Amino acid sequence: MKVIVLGAGIVGTASAWFLQKAGHEVIVLERQPGAAQETSFANGGQISVSHAEPWANPSAPLKLLKWLGREDAPLLFRLRPEWLQWRWGMEFLRQCTPGNTAYNIRQIIAIAEYSRQTLQSVRAETNIEYDCETRGILHFYTDQKEFQQSLPAANLMRDLGCPRQTINTNEVIRIEPALAPIRHKIVGGDFTTTDESGDVYKFTTGLASQCAEAGVTFRFNTFVTRLISEGTGASARIVGAEIIDEHGKHQTIRGDSVVVAMGSFSTHLLKPLGINLMIYPGKGYSATYPVIDNALAPRVSMTDDGHKLVISRLGDRLRVAGTCEINGYSRALNPVRCEAITRRTQELFPDACDYNQAQYWAGLRPLTPSNIPYIGKTKYSNLFLNTGHGTLGWTMGCGSGRAIAEIVSGRQPELDFAFTGMARTSVTRAMISIPVHVKNS
């Protein structure tokens, strides 16, 4: 079967990898000149099952009010005259109840743990070098109230099999001595030994190279303008994709199935087909600094929970990423938010890096209100979704690619997860956590 994959980020490339391993002919269409040029380019580097608590949680509404008007707020809403943003925001608030948060954590952990194990298998098979660190992930807190608020989610994660252990200040410093300059401010933390970190760009480009060697066709600088459908009702299907190629010519690429892995841009492509996904872009920032003193720079990947920043050592670089700006599709850098990242990093590790050589970047995370991605089927028999992974695309990427390859091949993935458009085998709930609004054909 010929499968067209739309998008060559970590999710699309992993989908292509597993589809070719399942015996399919695969062609990947990507508008950028290479793989991992957008959201997968310079993220925080964490493969973090322990980061399963969604942004939408019981403490989020009050935090949003507290952050209102702050240009450097960890989560910044810029309200626009745009119905999708308002509808997304209302659904986000609806997901902030304790019951919805607990359900969403279960789903996120299921796909994240499946993906972590899948990544380990791919790494063993391919030997891709991507500055991998398997030292775990450390969350630390500098606010006692926020630390106490984190405990129920951490306890639930432990109950679900994620070994996220609550620790005291002394243990935080023992695990990562580089935090010693702020020891007096740390009130506690938690540590997950099985989490990892690494450079998603290096991994994705390495995997894309091995995909190409295995027979996958990549067409870069290729814009998909629309998907062509035929039939109605149960017989509706996609017969191809209209593109503008690297020479500016219009073409039609035909295939037997299509996998949409275009992140935040999936929404616009699918809307004319009557598939309205609840995905909105969340602009995330990162800063990358050259390390100048190995003894003072951290080795363990960390999350600074109070500032919503993740910190990963990538060889001789330190990557610090985070914050979220709900403000449409602009990737323009806000100097205030960039400076806030560097200011906090200097507070933590004052002499570890050359902060004058900061490389700033912003990418659009495809956010669903619940943080649960769309992985599965649509009303079109041969159109599949692998999108909406939010802040956890690197964490969920390999597992999502493996799962969608199973679904395209007509098989049920071996994990208990709310796959889109598919019946659940175990966990059920009266409420759908991510609404998919579909118009009748």
Predicted regions and their residues:
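N-terminal Rossmann-like FAD-binding beta1-loop-alpha1 element of flavoenzymes
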Residues: 2-28
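Glycine-rich FAD pyrophosphate-binding loop
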Residues: 21-41
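Active-site substrate-recognition segment that forms the wall
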Residues: 31, 43-51, 55-95, 180, ...
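Rossmann-like flavin
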Residues: 86-210
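Predominantly flavin-linked oxidoreductase catalytic cores and closely associated redox partners
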Residues: 151, 155-184, 191-280
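C-terminal catalytic lobe of FAD-dependent flavoproteins
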Residues: 164, 305-306, 330-332, 346-441
